Design a protein with these regions (language model features):
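Alpha-helical transmembrane segments of multi-pass membrane proteins
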Residues: 1-278
Length: 278
């Protein structure tokens, strides 16, 4: 990092950021300006500063690191950058007015992490790349939590966002399970997929009950449905006799649990949230 190229890019990025802050501090002056008006130049300067600083560090990682360590550092830095920007821009770009960019950035964070893990582009037994990817996962989780909290606090409970958040969280959970199994030397993900989905389904159901959220309970049942379909359509026919017996036992247990939930809790499962809070 101690080179002229890095220092120059870093200075340009910080200077651009400083100019954007000055525009915000003297907003009335720049609002009346002929050329450098506050709108849209303040937003452009902020985004340009973020892009320059991001490129500055990514270029250094590409130049001085190699292999799985380089891709891991780039992944962790990207995940951290998206989270930091979501937090740093909360006042300048309120989530009420810029909902789509926040939700898009949240989805991109999960997608970038998933592409890196599922791409099998790293050495599973190497400690440093593995730790970097777990750091990346931590930043992605923090990003999901922060944006979700801001959304629910400032905008309120909206079914489309809850569904979107659960899809991202489920995809992230499966990817983290895949990463853990790869680090443990397990290439096959069939069993891990089913177990991970089952755990996610139980968590969704528990949260749906505790938070009185009908949509979460329905999503949980959909998750269990995916597990059942996979067991019936794929796992059952690809296994030997003993494996089929185990699958039938698992199917029986899942169906028994779902039957119990429906018979004992059907009024709670499908009751409207408004009725539950009355």
């Amino acid at each position: 990092f101690l080179n002229s190229s890095f220092a120059t890019s870093l200075f340009v990025g910080l200077a651009t950021r400083a100019f954007a802050l000055l525009m915000g501090r003297y907003r009335s002056l720049f609002t009346e300006a002929r050329y450098l008006r506050y709108t849209p130049w303040n937003s452009i300067m902020l985004l340009a500063a973020a892009a320059i600083l991001y490129y500055t560090f990514m270029a250094e990682f590409a130049l001085h690191l190699a292999g799985a360590t380089r891709s891991g550092m780039m992944l962790a830095f990207t995940s951290a950058a998206i989270f930091i920007l979501s937090y740093a821009f909360k006042k300048r770009f309120p989530i009420k007015q810029y909902t789509i960019p926040y939700l898009t950035a949240m989805g991109m964070n999960v997608l970038i992490y998933a592409i890196n893990i599922w791409g099998d582009q790293w050495v599973y037994t190497s400690l440093t790349p593995a730790l970097l990817r777990w750091f990346a996962a931590a930043f992605v989780i923090a990003n999901l939590y922060y944006v979700a909290r801001q959304y629910y606090t400032l905008i309120g409970l909206k079914t489309p966002f809850t569904v979107y958040l659960n899809v991202l969280a489920l995809f992230l959970w499966l990817t983290m399970a895949r990463s853990f199994l790869l680090q443990a030397g397990v290439e096959d993900f069939d069993a891990g997929f089913s177990v991970s989905l089952s755990i996610a389904g139980f968590i969704q159901m528990a949260l749906g009950m505790r938070l009185h959220q009908k949509v979460l309970r329905i999503i949980s049942l959909s998750t269990f449905g995916i597990v059942l379909l996979k067991l019936i359509l794929k796992d059952l026919w690809a296994m030997p006799t003993i494996g089929k017996i185990i699958v039938f036992i698992i199917l029986g247990l899942i169906l028994l649990i779902l039957s119990f939930l429906y018979q004992k809790l059907k009024d709670v499962l499908f009751k409207n949230d408004e009725d539950e809070t009355d």
